[in-house]
Amino acid sequence: MGLSDLSKAPGQALGDMLQLGNIESVIQWGRGNSLWPFPFATACCGIEYMSTACSDYDIARFGAERPSFSPRQADMILVLGTITYKMAPVLRQIYDQMAEPKFVISVGACASSGGMFNTYGVLQGVDRILPVDIYVPGCPPRPEAILDALVKLQTKLKTQGLEARRQEVMQKIQELNERNKPLVVR
């Protein structure tokens, strides 16, 4: 058996045994299939997230089985519940500590728009301080809706390049800075 025979495996050509691609497609595949969520739960949406993580819905099937309670080890933050003005700087600091690329899912009516709490102490939407990627409607949203948001984020990650993602986030942050004055704790 010579070197020329190595290119032919029994019943297969060498081209059938190789998977060709570039490094960015491998990174997109990895990012899309292994998200490390940081649940920032402040209200009833946090209880629904717990249901999502349990065996009935099993968030592990979607590659997000390892919740991280350290922002430096997370790449996705789920904002679950009402955010007050006193809590907003803490949430922003947690977001800033996360490694790039980072993703934000706003879960429930309270996180997305302040919900039924239209008061002076409640932030009327987390998108005033963070660049939100996906909104999950509901009060509280069902676990299926949270899983749907996770699948949509994974699809977005698998189809969008890293440079396009970086430009999108920088544009969102610039819009946030132009639209909002510095956040003042009341």
UniProtKB/Swiss-Prot annotation:
Amino-acid positions noted as binding [4Fe-4S] cluster in the UniProt annotation, renumbered to this chain: 44-45, 110, 139
EC class name: translocase
InterPro entries, A to Z: NADH_UbQ_OxRdtase-like_20kDa, NADH_UQ_OxRdtase_20Kd_su
EC number: 7.1.1.-
Organism of provenance: Leptospira borgpetersenii serovar Hardjo-bovis (strain JB197)
GO CC terms, sorted: plasma membrane; respiratory chain complex I
UniProt catalytic activity: a quinone + NADH + 5 H(+)(in) = a quinol + NAD(+) + 4 H(+)(out)
NCBIfam families (alphabetical): nuoB_fam, PRK06411.1, PRK14814.1
Keyword set, alphabetical order: 4Fe-4S, Cell inner membrane, Cell membrane, Iron, Iron-sulfur, Membrane, Metal-binding, NAD, Quinone, Translocase, Transport, Ubiquinone
GO molecular function: 4 iron, 4 sulfur cluster binding; iron ion binding; NADH dehydrogenase (ubiquinone) activity; NADH:ubiquinone reductase (non-electrogenic) activity; quinone binding
Assembly and oligomerization: NDH-1 is composed of 14 different subunits. Subunits NuoB, C, D, E, F, and G constitute the peripheral sector of the complex.
Family annotation (PANTHER family): NADH DEHYDROGENASE, NADH DEHYDROGENASE [UBIQUINONE] IRON-SULFUR PROTEIN 7, MITOCHONDRIAL
Co-factor binding comment: Binds 1 [4Fe-4S] cluster.
Official protein name in the record: NADH-quinone oxidoreductase subunit B
Matches recorded under SUPFAM superfamilies: HydA/Nqo6-like
Keyword Mitochondrion: no
Membership in a protein family: Belongs to the complex I 20 kDa subunit family.
Bilayer disposition of the protein: Peripheral membrane protein
Gene Ontology biological process terms from the UniProt entry: aerobic respiration; electron transport coupled proton transport
Function recorded in the entry: NDH-1 shuttles electrons from NADH, via FMN and iron-sulfur (Fe-S) centers, to quinones in the respiratory chain. The immediate electron acceptor for the enzyme in this species is believed to be ubiquinone. Couples the redox reaction to proton translocation (for every two electrons transferred, four hydrogen ions are translocated across the cytoplasmic membrane), and thus conserves the redox energy in a proton gradient.
